[in-house]
Amino acid sequence: MQFSGVVLILISMTLVNFVFFETKVEAGKFGKCKPNICAKTCQTEKGKGMGYCNKTECVCSEW
């Protein structure tokens, strides 16, 4: 009974690691625009008030 519990824990840990690894890879593909860097870039370099991420590109507001 204890052996099957250990095997079950090992299998579940492997599945959890696989799911989190896949999530990181998927987020990396679409994570090109970083909101904090976008906002700073719009404020300092372009003289705009705010910046936000629209999918993968940084968009500066007009005001």
Curated annotation (Swiss-Prot):
GO-annotated cellular components: extracellular region
Disulfide-bond pairs as recorded: C33-C53, C38-C58, C42-C60
Highest classification ranks of the organism: Eukaryota, Metazoa, Ecdysozoa, Arthropoda, Chelicerata
Role this protein plays: Reversibly and voltage-independently blocks voltage-gated potassium channels rKv1.2/KCNA2 (73%) (IC(50)=196 nM), hKv1.3/KCNA3 (50%) (IC(50)=508 nM), Shaker IR (30%), rKv1.6/KCNA6 (22%) (at 0.5 uM). Interaction of Ts15 with Kv1.3/KCNA3 is stronger than its interaction with Kv1.2/KCNA2.
Keywords associated with the record: Disulfide bond, Ion channel impairing toxin, Neurotoxin, Potassium channel impairing toxin, Secreted, Signal, Toxin, Voltage-gated potassium channel impairing toxin
GO molecular function, one term: toxin activity
Statement: the UniProt record of this protein carries the keyword tRNA-binding: no
Top-level taxon of the source organism: Eukaryota
Misc. remarks from the entry: Negative results: does not block voltage-gated sodium channels rNav1.4/SCN4A, hNav1.5/SCN5A, mNav1.6/SCN8A and rNav1.8/SCN10A, and Kv1.1/KCNA1, rKv1.4/KCNA4, rKv1.5/KCNA5, rKv2.1/KCNB1, hKv3.1/KCNC1, rKv4.2/KCND2, rKv4.3/KCND3 and hERG potassium channels, when tested at a concentration of 0.5 uM.
Protein known as: Potassium channel toxin alpha-KTx 21.1
Presence of keyword Signal: yes
Domain remarks: Has the structural arrangement of an alpha-helix connected to antiparallel beta-sheets by disulfide bonds (CS-alpha/beta).
Organism: Tityus serrulatus
Family named by the database record: Belongs to the short scorpion toxin superfamily. Potassium channel inhibitor family. Alpha-KTx 21 subfamily.
Residues in the signal sequence: 1-27
Cellular compartment(s): Secreted
Tissue occurrence: Expressed by the venom gland.
